[in-house]
Amino acid sequence: MAKAASTLVFPIIFLVMFALIEQNMGCMAVLGSCGVITDCSGSCKTKFGQDASGDCDRDGGQGTCMCGYPCPHDKLHM
């Protein structure tokens, strides 16, 4: 019986850890091409607020403007 209980402890700990990590990561959005959006960081702050950050992900071509911002409280985390 003790062994069965201990095998459930680790999965429960990992589920709780992943739930907490997902809440702290925030939300992400793609605004468009860095060739069109010249100031990615400024555009993200304008659209999502002063706590937002933006970077141009140069994965190919002109790159993609990626925004990171705090998730609204009413958004569900799944």
UniProtKB/Swiss-Prot annotation:
Keywords: Antimicrobial, Disulfide bond, Fungicide, Plant defense, Secreted, Signal
GO biological process: defense response to fungus; killing of cells of another organism
InterPro entries: LCR (IPR039641)
Entry keyword annotation includes Secreted: yes
Chief location: secreted
Disulfide bridge positions per record: C27-C71, C34-C56, C40-C65, C44-C67
Localization annotation: Secreted
Gene Ontology cellular component terms for the protein in this record: extracellular region
Keyword set includes 4Fe-4S: no
Signal peptide: 1-23
Family classification: Belongs to the DEFL family.
Protein name: Putative defensin-like protein 170
Gene: LCR62
